[in-house]
């Protein structure tokens, strides 16, 4: 079998992996094999946590809406149900921002749905 000299291809591949892991500590950014493993692990975590980030923000918005709603003697569940029944289409992100930044507007929304 003839020898294959990969030339710059192998070096370019290794340098891309090492560039991806620059900033990692110790051998995880210096040695190719460990850097490759950590790079794959980091990409796996990034993929997983993109979904988790959406989940966490939704939980945060629901908590904020619930706290503001309970200050006005209505539960989160009843509030969301009333919004749908009155065909008021505000998503949880916007409701949470209104609840945090503009209490009067939030109270007005609650007055409309009661």
From Swiss-Prot:
Give a short account of what the protein does: Binds directly to 23S ribosomal RNA and is necessary for the in vitro assembly process of the 50S ribosomal subunit. It is not involved in the protein synthesizing functions of that subunit.
Which HAMAP family does its entry note? Ribosomal_bL20
The molecular function terms of the Gene Ontology recorded here are: rRNA binding; structural constituent of ribosome
Keywords, A to Z, come to:
Chloroplast, Plastid, Ribonucleoprotein, Ribosomal protein, RNA-binding, rRNA-binding
What does the similarity note say?
A: Belongs to the bacterial ribosomal protein bL20 family.
What is this protein's name? Large ribosomal subunit protein bL20c
The organism encoding this protein is: Psilotum nudum
Q: Where in the cell is it found?
A: Plastid, Chloroplast
A single Gene Ontology CC annotation of this entry is:
ribosome
InterPro entries membership: Ribosomal_bL20, RIBOSOMAL_L20_CS, Ribosomal_protein_bL20_C
Biological process (GO) annotations?
ribosomal large subunit assembly; translation
């Amino acid at each position: 079998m003839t020898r294959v000299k990969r030339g710059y291809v192998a070096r370019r591949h290794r340098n891309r992996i090492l560039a991806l892991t620059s900033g990692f500590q110790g051998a995880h950014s210096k040695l190719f094999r460990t850097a490759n493993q950590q790079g794959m692990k980091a990409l796996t975590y990034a993929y997983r946590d993109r979904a988790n980030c959406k989940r966490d923000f939704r939980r945060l918005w629901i908590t904020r809406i619930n706290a503001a709603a309970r200050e006005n003697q209505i539960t989160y569940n009843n509030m969301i149900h009333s919004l749908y029944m009155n065909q008021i289409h505000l998503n949880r992100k916007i409701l949470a921002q209104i609840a945090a930044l503009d209490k009067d507007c939030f109270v007005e929304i609650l007055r409309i749905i009661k």
